[in-house]
UniProtKB/Swiss-Prot annotation:
Source species of the chain: Antirrhinum majus (Garden snapdragon)
Protein name: Transcription factor CYCLOIDEA
Any one Gene Ontology cellular component term annotated for this protein: nucleus
Main location as per UniProt: nucleus
Subcellular localization(s) per the UniProt record: Nucleus
R domain boundaries: 200-217
Residue ranges of every copy of the TCP domain listed in the record: 87-145
Family annotation (PROSITE patterns): R, TCP
Pfam families per record: TCP (PF03634)
Function, in words: Involved in the dorsovental asymmetry of flowers. Retards growth rate and reduces organ number in the dorsal region of flowers. Binds specifically to the DNA sequence 5'-GGNCCCNC-3', and is able to bind to the RAD promoter sequence in vivo.
Amino acid sequence: MFGKNTYLHLPQVSSSLHSRAATSVVDLNGNEIQLHDMLSGHYLTTANAPVLESTALFNNNNNFNHDVVNGLNRDPSPTFPTKQAVKKDRHSKIYTSQGPRDRRVRLSIGIARKFFDLQEMLGFDKPSKTLDWLLTKSKTAIKELVQSKSTKSNSSSPCDDCEEVVSVDSENVTDHSKGKSLKANNKCKEAMDSHQAAAKESRAKARARARERTKEKMCIKQLNEAIVLRNHQFEVSGTREAFVHPVFGFHQQNYGNASHENWDQSNLSSQSNQLCAILNQHKFIN
């Protein structure tokens, strides 16, 4: 009478009625009829699966819409991690002191031309044979290189070389700085010596000028003293003549005047001699 789809989706239409079916009583035409949940087992077993799937899809759609609104444009389809294929190197590595090395060697254009020309001249079909031939021919050079490396490593390590270079540089810097300081000190000493010599010379000249001034002052003082002494003698001689009384009259007066004149002349000559001697001495000293 009812289709399968309508029968299955009948509880979805009135979910509240289904929730109340087991516990509530419905009044139909005054008669109390208790509804039994006859479809509960069938709903839980058959109809629950599609409802759960539909709700899961609805939740996924809601999550996708929420991500789009928030700016996260994620793929709603489930993603599975895929393993990237690792490329296998067909060539085996060679382990050296500096780590694994590839057996393949990339040559420049010029070296490749020379190498293949040599290979053609030798008639080898493989490049490894050509390299073997080159290594065998250069054994002596390789031995010399190994010996030189060993002697250098035994004689001095790189740290020692660096320390020696640093010490030499520091010594050169100190010597250069010492040389500069010595030159500066020498210049300062020379300047001080020249200044001191000029000061000494100026002081000596000042002392010489002072001595000349003192000598001139002494000469002038002696001349003034001689003049004062002569005037004093003139005054004394005039007072003595005033108190002399004539004894013999006219002859006595003339004798007195002659003697006075002779005394004055001798006094003046002695003073002039003294002045000449002082002046001559002053000139000789200068």
